[in-house]
Amino acid sequence: MMACRTLCLVVVMVASLGTSGVGGRSVEGASRMEKLLSSSNSPSSTPLGFLSQDHSVNKRQVFDQACKGVYDRNLFKKLDRVCEDCYNLYRKPFVATTCRENCYSNWVFRQCLDDLLLSDVIDEYVSNVQMVGK
């Protein structure tokens, strides 16, 4: 009897979460990210562009050698973590690669900050991008 009540309670909770619009932010964020990435003219930002490149995926270096600013491993890790988390949110390889382009100085990185709810510390991240940038 107790197991039946617990099961019914779980079913009711799951059903109410499904109809409450809990997943709305992800859908909204995904459509904004798709629109942002489709407006970019970079070949790596096309949804299937990564398939035309080498299929094996190597672990990305912590820092980008094209970035000519201050070399600070912790700073690069912090910026790279935003792109990794954004990739984990959308599970699209082109999100991670486009996020890192131009030493993190791009609109996808900014959108990732917003989608990861980091807008309250955006000034700190902008400052970090300027430090490592070109």
Curated annotation (Swiss-Prot):
This is Crustacean hyperglycemic hormones isoform A. GO terms for molecular function: neuropeptide hormone activity. The modification Pyrrolidone carboxylic acid is found at Q61. Belongs to the arthropod CHH/MIH/GIH/VIH hormone family. It comes from the Eukaryota. It holds the Pfam family Crust_neurohorm. It is found in: Secreted. The lineage of its organism: Eukaryota, Metazoa, Ecdysozoa, Arthropoda, Crustacea. CHH is the most abundant hormone in the sinus gland of isopods and decapods which controls the blood sugar level. Has a secretagogue action over the amylase released from the midgut gland. May act as a stress hormone. MIH may inhibit Y-organs where molting hormone (ecdysteroid) is secreted and a molting cycle is initiated when MIH secretion diminishes or stops. GO terms for cellular component: extracellular region. The modification Valine amide is found at V132. Produced by the medulla terminalis X-organ in the eyestalks and transported to the sinus gland where they are stored and released. Present also in the ventral nervous system. Its main location: secreted. Stereoinversion of L-Phe (form CHH-A-I) to D-Phe (form CHH-A-II). Disulfide bonds join C67-C103, C83-C99, C86-C112. GO terms for biological process: circadian rhythm; glucose metabolic process; neuropeptide signaling pathway. The modification D-phenylalanine is found at F63. Residues 1-24 form the signal peptide. Keywords: Amidation, Carbohydrate metabolism, Cleavage on pair of basic residues, D-amino acid, Disulfide bond, Glucose metabolism, Hormone, Neuropeptide, Pyrrolidone carboxylic acid, Secreted, Signal. InterPro entries: Crust_neurhormone_CS, Crust_neurohorm, Crust_neurohorm_sf, Hyperglycemic, Hyperglycemic1.
